[in-house]
């Protein structure tokens, strides 16, 4: 469970722990990870939780995380790609990628691929990726994915990263056909979390103005929990909202863009053969 120290991720991790799952909680701050693990153990009888730390702004750290997970756990039944970020000003990751593309798409793309063999060996298994309805305003400019030649628009860049989540899920599901591993993604709703805290003044204002109509993290986690654990989920490659499969924006059904994004992502993350 990535990005599980607060908000939707924490609520999802706690719900799954209360259902009896062994939950591995990821965060970028060791103190926060430890605190959440202790709090979940206190709130959930016989909860089996532990933590791992990695910075998704560094692909080297993502690779280290994948090795640590594989070393510590013989089985991996569910991978929830929840970690995400928003920023209103352009800045690079440690690898030089646009911040939101790097953390919201390339990091989970790499982590998922590095853990695929463990997931296949644990089949039936599930991959759940948190996207957003914001993908509807996203445009993937393959000639300028890092926003080096355009005026930066943080919300559009966020939307592009969430569109990438859906395209990634679609191609991943196709590649996993017959493996016993499913891949689905979701819109959690507009949730009252701290995701806008690192988005600059403009982003924080957007978050504050929208907070009155936002869902609680527990409510926002419902679709993630459903896709991770419900026996009713028997599909793959779908986009969910409120625990139901729905049609994403037309751009999310672009087969050529789906294939191209996969190829580009393989190259950028060093997975290309």
Give each language-model segment a name.
Residues 1-194, 270-272:
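Rossmann-fold NAD(P)H-dependent dehydrogenase/reductase core
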Residues 32-35, 260, 264:
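A non-catalytic, amphipathic alpha-helix used as a structural packing/dimerization or gating element
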Residues 2, 150, 154, 206-210, ...:
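A short, mixed-charge helix-start or loop-turn motif at secondary-structure junctions
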Residues 125, 201, 230-233:
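Short, well-ordered loop/turn and helix-capping segments at boundaries between secondary-structure elements
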Residues 259, 266-273:
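Intracellular terminal tails of multi-pass secondary transporters
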Residues 143-145, 192-210:
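A glycine/serine/threonine-rich, flexible loop-to-helix segment
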Residues 32-35, 53, 205-206, 210-216:
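Extended hydrophobic/aromatic segments used for targeting, binding, or gating
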Residues 161, 185, 207-248, 253-259, ...:
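C-terminal helical subdomain
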């Amino acid at each position: 469970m990535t990005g599980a120290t607060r908000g939707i991720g924490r609520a999802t991790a706690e719900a799954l722990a209360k259902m009896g799952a062994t939950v591995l909680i990821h965060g970028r701050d060791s103190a926060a990870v430890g605190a959440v693990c202790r709090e979940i153990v206190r709130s959930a009888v016989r909860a089996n939780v532990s933590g791992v730390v990695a910075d998704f702004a560094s692909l080297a750290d993502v690779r280290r995380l994948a090795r640590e997970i594989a070393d510590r756990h013989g089985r991996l039944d569910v991978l929830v790609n929840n970690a995400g970020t928003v920023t209103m000003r352009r800045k690079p990751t440690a690898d030089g990628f646009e911040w939101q593309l790097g953390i919201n798409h390339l990091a989970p793309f790499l982590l998922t691929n590095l853990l695929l063999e463990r997931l296949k060996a644990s089949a039936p298994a599930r991959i759940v990726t948190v996207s957003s309805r914001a993908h509807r305003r996203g445009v993937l400019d393959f000639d300028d994915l890092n926003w080096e030649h355009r005026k930066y628009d943080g919300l559009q860049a966020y939307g592009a990263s969430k569109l990438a989540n859906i395209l990634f899920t679609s191609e991943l599901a196709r590649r996993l056909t017959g493996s016993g591993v499913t891949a689905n993604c979701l819109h959690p709703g507009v949730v009252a979390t701290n995701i806008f805290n690192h988005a600059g003044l403009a982003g924080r204002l957007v978050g504050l103005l929208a907070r009155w109509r936002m869902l609680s993290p527990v409510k926002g986690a419902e679709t993630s929990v459903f896709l991770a654990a419900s026996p009713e989920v028997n599909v793959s490659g779908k986009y969910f909202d409120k625990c139901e499969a729905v049609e994403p924006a037309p751009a999310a059904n672009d087969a050529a863009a789906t294939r191209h994004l996969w190829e580009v992502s393989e190259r950028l993350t060093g997975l290309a053969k």
